[in-house]
């Protein structure tokens, strides 16, 4: 398969995986917080909260059809074009930070959709998708994923899921589990599932 980023053999004999990726994810929100939300970060920390919780509240209070603002999430590069740059399209003076934050959340989701569309040329859409990482900690962001992909989004329990995968492989290698499927059945659980609107 030549039109996806990485293809390789999978740990289960006879299976292969395809991977798409680019630096277009939660680092975009991190940039926004670092550059423009330092006062909110200090206030949130004083209240025992995360500044990302504040961002989620702001996004939740901003409707998806409130502004039409578009964000291209290429702050750290773009695998679509070497010259691809991040930008806001449709930014007007009346828009507030909620519009900008929601545009960042949506821009990241649509970048993931671009990757998923490439992968779906080679298989059917799954009944659900699993999401991990920074965006998975945000109910608001996960809801945007569910709404854009129009399938349930399942969030695995835990935070260090790469280490969990390594532990499952070790469990199979040492004979603790008979198969990767058995290891996954025993070790993977889900914190929540969000349905599309």
Locations of the language-model features?
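Glycine/Thr-rich phosphate-binding loops that ligate phosphate moieties of nucleotide
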Residues: 2-197
């Amino acid at each position: 398969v030549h039109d996806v980023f990485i293809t390789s053999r999978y740990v289960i004999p006879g299976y292969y995986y395809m991977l798409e990726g680019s630096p277009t994810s939660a680092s975009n929100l991190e940039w926004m917080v670092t550059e423009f939300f330092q006062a909110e970060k200090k206030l949130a920390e004083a209240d025992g909260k995360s500044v990302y919780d504040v961002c989620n509240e702001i996004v939740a209070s901003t409707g998806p059809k409130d502004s039409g603002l578009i964000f291209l999430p290429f702050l750290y590069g773009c695998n679509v074009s070497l010259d691809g740059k991040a930008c806001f399209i449709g930014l007007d003076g009346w828009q507030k930070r909620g519009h900008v934050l929601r545009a960042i959340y949506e821009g990241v989701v649509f970048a993931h959709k671009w990757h998923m569309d490439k992968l779906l040329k080679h298989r059917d859409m799954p009944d659900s998708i699993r999401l991990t990482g920074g965006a998975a900690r945000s109910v608001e962001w996960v809801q945007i994923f569910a709404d854009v992909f129009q399938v349930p989004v399942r969030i695995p329990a835990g935070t260090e899921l790469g280490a969990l995968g390594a532990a499952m492989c070790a469990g199979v290698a040492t004979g603790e589990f008979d198969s990767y499927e058995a290891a996954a059945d025993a070790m993977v659980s889900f914190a929540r599932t969000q349905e599309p609107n």
